[in-house]
Amino acid sequence: KTLYGPGFIIDELCGLTFRISSHSFYQVNATQTEVLYRKAIEMAHFTGTETAMDAYCGTGTIGLVAAKGLPGAETAHAARVIGVDNVASAIKDARENARHNGIENADFTAEDAGHFMDKLAKEGESLDVLLMDPPRAGSNEQFLRSACSLAPKRIVYISCNPNTQARDVEYLVKNGYRLTEVHPVDMFPHTNHVENICALELQ
């Protein structure tokens, strides 16, 4: 319930402006988030032709950066981005963020990521790049199984819990992927927490 004001805040990230509502996930360290997202986009190796999925997309931050391209490197972007998150208010923000930033090659759906991926796999859809940033508990078998069925050429997995990330990466490696790069980012200085990015390629 909003007692006063618009019910959201505005922040700028990677040259884009984002609206964040109270129930929407958003990284709290903006400086390091730019480092995190820049590295993730670099790992995706976009050329302007790819269809990318932004799973667990929140307010659409990394998906919209992927759709637009990083400042100074706008040619390295996805042709199309599909975002999914189970928080309806976050998806509302993501759609507004796309509109506000003039991004027309990104669509967002409010649905459980695992169910959505499963549906895409059963419909015979295909992906070139999967960007995933699940909660601390990691992903689940339904999502990972569907991801392997969709067989994107590259998966960029961002995680705030290296333990559950390692578990999920092991599943992906056992099902046709090769771990090519690991890059930690210190999002929370002077704590034992770290954000970690893994890049995987289809063998």
Describe the residue ranges of each PLM region:
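Rossmann-like S-adenosyl-L-methionine
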Residues: 1-203
